[in-house]
UniProtKB/Swiss-Prot annotation:
Domain of life: Bacteria
Organism: Mycobacterium leprae (strain TN)
InterPro entries: DUF2631 (IPR024341)
Stretches assigned to coiled coil: none
Family of this protein: To M.tuberculosis Rv2876.
Name under which the protein is recorded: Uncharacterized protein ML1584
Transmembrane regions: 27-47, 52-72
Keywords carried by this UniProt record: Cell membrane, Membrane, Transmembrane, Transmembrane helix
Gene Ontology CC terms, in alphabetical order: plasma membrane
Any Pfam family the entry gives: DUF2631
Mode of membrane association: Multi-pass membrane protein
Cell compartments where the protein resides: Cell membrane
Length: 84
């Protein structure tokens, strides 16, 4: 009778990525959250500029909102176990 257990993948194969033995292959999600907040800050800081039209402002606000949405989705998804 065949087993119904699925095969579990431990992550990264050491043959493919030698640095996994040193623990460098895991993505640090907190670092990416900080980078996302920094990117939002940079986008909103560019609102203060020497441009006359407001089309650029709407693009900057839109991209900052998009980054914020992705950041919050990732943060909440990890807390609730939806994303590993």
């Amino acid at each position: 009778m065949a087993s119904t257990e699925g095969e579990h993948n431990a992550g990264v194969d050491p043959a493919e990525v030698p640095s996994v033995a040193w623990g460098w292959s895991r993505i640090n999600h907190h670092t990416w959250h900080i980078v996302g907040l920094f990117a939002i800050g940079l986008l909103l800081a560019m609102l203060r500029g020497n441009h006359i039209g407001h089309v650029e402002n709407w693009y900057l606000i839109g991209f900052a909102a998009l980054v914020f949405f992705v950041l919050i989705r990732d943060l909440l998804g990890r807390r609730r176990g939806w994303i590993r």
